[in-house]
Amino acid sequence: MGVVSLPGIGPLPLYGFQRPGMLLFGLVPLALLALYLVVQARRRRRLHRYTDAPVAQSPWRHLPIAVSLLSLVLLTIALATPTHDMRIPRNRAVIMLVIDMSQSMRATDVEPNRLKAAEQAASQFASQLTPGINLGLVGFAGTPYLLVPPTPQHQATIDALKKLDFADSTATGEAIFTALHAISATAVAGGDTPPPARIVLLSDGGENKPSNPSDPHDGVYTAARLAKDEGVPISTITFGTKGGEIEMDGQKVAVPVSTDQMKMVAKLSGGQSYTATNLGELQKSYNAIENEIGYRTVPGPGSAGWLRLGVLTALIATALALLINRRLPT
């Protein structure tokens, strides 16, 4: 739900009152308005007793009382404490970066190559991440390596990203299993309730070790289903273009990006799937993931804006009363 926000005043939410009973004070300005109308009617009748001629009266004389009543309404809303959505950093969440280091990541369709661009974007993601989040890193090709266990010291991940190097094959399923194991170890050490966790998987395509993604032991789909069962969604980022090439044994080999398997991994695990063909798009994908998992949205008190507006309106009413209804000494 959209919330109006005024410069110098702040947001003015009008839903989810924490103290709705205070809205009964809204009857006070209504009663005062009724009393004012009765007094004005009696005043007109009293004037007509002495003269039948119309008495010239400025309609502006009603403005101070109207603004005063408006200020009471605004202050009543402030007392009822409306709520608005607040983004609160997650302090115990665990995020595992899982980055493909296979030979296809040598492709230079993204400068300087897919892996280096992935390192740059992941480093920026780590540096901007909410400080209380535990961040870890798994690098993988044919074999996954837990390079950084989950830790709130994000610099450890930034340093490890600089050391990623190419290797043969792509064992995406094993890499996910490794990340899940690291998350489980953090949950055991962290207390009674497991922290919210997420895997961020970056690759340019599907796994080839094993060749069957549904392999019951190491298949990537098997790993994705386990992640779903453990409540760990996988956000996948498919990175690269259809025109990617690498040089092997003096020959150009096409390594086009493949999105189908990555999308299925995200779907099976309950996560989101992203695609990026350049560094800018990759950074946007990371930013979207950070907004999704780095914070949680909770209702918070939103009466400050109404209080400021009510006080400002009361001051305006006072100024109008002095300006319009002033009496000069004779």
Swiss-Prot record:
Record family assignment: Belongs to the UPF0353 family.
Name the UniProt record assigns to this protein: UPF0353 protein MAP_3434
PROSITE patterns referenced in this protein's UniProt entry, alphabetically: VWFA (PS50234)
Membrane topology: Multi-pass membrane protein
Source species of the chain: Mycolicibacterium paratuberculosis (strain ATCC BAA-968 / K-10)
Cystine connections: none
Residue ranges the record marks as coiled coil: none
Superkingdom of origin: Bacteria
KW Membrane (keyword) present: yes
HAMAP family, per database record: UPF0353
Spans traversing the lipid bilayer: 21-41, 63-83, 304-324
Compartmental location: Cell membrane
Domain VWFA residue range list: 94-289
Leader peptide range in chain numbering: none
Keywords, comma-separated and alphabetical: Cell membrane, Membrane, Transmembrane, Transmembrane helix
Any single GO CC term annotated in Swiss-Prot or TrEMBL for this entry: plasma membrane
